Amino acid sequence: MSAESAAIVQPIALIPATKTARQARIAALLTAQSVRSQAELAALLADDGVQVTQATLSRDLVELGAVRVRADGGLVYAVPQAGVDRTPHAAVSKEYLDARMTRLCAELLVTAEASANLVVLRTPPGAANFLAMAIDHSVLPDILGTIAGDDTVLVIARDPFGGAAIAERFLQFAEEPGT
């Protein structure tokens, strides 16, 4: 092989034909770029040598917890960051966490209602797990935890009567300017 042809040859990353490898590649693609449709995602996977049917891709997206969120002037797929350490590190400021929660609430929060120490947050279908995970990762001190369904997040306040204040905070996050 000549020096010229050796310079042209690019190494090719091989992706195993396993469900785990396919889902890892899907998560990586959704994290790296805005993907607006399953057809676009299937084309990106095909470019990587991963052939997938629409039904399999749909199941993979559900299993990954992918949801469609508003970004770049339209809806794009997003995957929650699973396995992330929930303890904030020094590099992550309160301002960053508040800005992230503001953005997510502006994109996902439909309503917030409280009763005693409980807050019920409504989201578009399929987005509740994404919002609940973001709340859990933000480590808000007055929140004990969350439980998510398809379009509903139950937030449990530490204070027996703190639900109203937390509901109000989420509504403020959703209404802040610049979102």
UniProtKB/Swiss-Prot annotation:
Pathway: Amino-acid biosynthesis; L-arginine biosynthesis [regulation]
GO molecular function: arginine binding; DNA binding; DNA-binding transcription factor activity
Annotated InterPro entries: Arg_repress, Arg_repress_C, Arg_repress_C_sf, Arg_repress_DNA-bd, WH-like_DNA-bd_sf, WH_DNA-bd_sf
Keyword annotations from UniProtKB, A to Z: Amino-acid biosynthesis, Arginine biosynthesis, Cytoplasm, DNA-binding, Repressor, Transcription, Transcription regulation
GO BP: L-arginine biosynthetic process; protein complex oligomerization; regulation of arginine biosynthetic process
Subcellular location: Cytoplasm
Database matches in Gene3D superfamilies: 3.30.1360.40, Winged helix-like DNA-binding domain superfamily/Winged helix DNA-binding domain
Keyword check for DNA-binding: yes
GO cellular component, one term: cytoplasm
Broad class of where this protein is predominantly found: cytoplasm
Taxonomy, superkingdom: Bacteria
Family per similarity comment: Belongs to the ArgR family.
Function (record text): Regulates arginine biosynthesis genes.
Record's protein name: Arginine repressor
The encoding gene: argR
